[in-house]
Amino acid sequence: MPDDGTGSQEHVDWSPWLGQPLTAGVLTDYDGTLALVVEDRDQAVPLPGARDVISALADRFAVVAVVSGRPVGYLESQLGRIPRVTLVGLYGLERIENGELRVMNTAAQWDEIVVSAATSVAQAAPPGLEIEMKGMTLVLHSRRAPETLQWARQWAAERARSTGLVAQHGRSSVELLPPVHFDKGTVVEELSAGLSSVCFFGDDVGDLPAFRVLRRLRSEGKTTIAVGVESPEQPDELANAVDLLVRGPEQALALLSSLADGTWPYPFDG
């Protein structure tokens, strides 16, 4: 990350990706990066051409992955199984890699507790609060009813204390997850093993751990670039956590497309 915290593109050097693609990785979030953020999450779809760009990236780079808080089955339904592309869902709890589904076994034992929490909140939630079961996690969305966010966070905190689940806050949501150490940062660290350079594209609170890991990996000698994507759910910390801030998913996809084509993406109008 740039020392001045500005996210200025003047600090960004893509030459390792262009000159040494076989030791480089390209990792990206899904919502707000490959797809527009929409009020109804069920209506979010990849931008036109996104799947082709991801496929082209996989033809060029050593590691390409889509890393999301969504269930991996959802990612597969939107993007398909693209050869040599790893789909990581639920912040790392599950993934599709080399055509095979893998689930973190240590989290599976929490299934019944999460289901019980979903049943409980469905009976108590105020009108307008959206309840989403995401496999082994439970999310309460207040995007359509912002006045319910405080209630959701308080309920989640109490449920976390009584069950051992972990409450994780988003800008307009709160998520209950199994108490297993995983996030987008742990995913980035795992996927970057053996690479000389790695970049990550993200827009939300859940992407901040990935950017923090990139900062540490850089201090250890790896070349890293953190790309922030402006979105309605952009956290205040995003601008100071990234090297480059692009204007929405369309510009993020254009940058990814440049990398896939092996063309120089700088200066990029960020």
Walk through the language-model features, giving the residues of each.
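Non-catalytic pre-domain segments flanking phosphatase-related domains
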Residues: 1-30, 34-42, 49, 59, ...
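Mg2+-dependent phosphoryl-transfer enzymes with acidic/Ser/Thr/Gly-rich catalytic loops
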Residues: 2-9, 21, 47, 185-270
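Conserved Rossmann-like nucleotide-cofactor binding loop
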Residues: 33, 72, 206
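Glycine-rich phosphate-binding "P-loop"
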Residues: 34-44, 171-179
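Active-site phosphate-binding/coordination module
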Residues: 45-133
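A structural signal for isolated positions on well-ordered beta-strands in alpha/beta enzyme cores
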Residues: 63-65, 86, 139, 199, ...
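Short hydrophobic/aromatic-enriched beta-strand-loop microsegments
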Residues: 84-91, 150, 219-226
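Conserved acidic, metal-coordinating active-site core of Asp-based
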Residues: 128, 132-214, 219-223
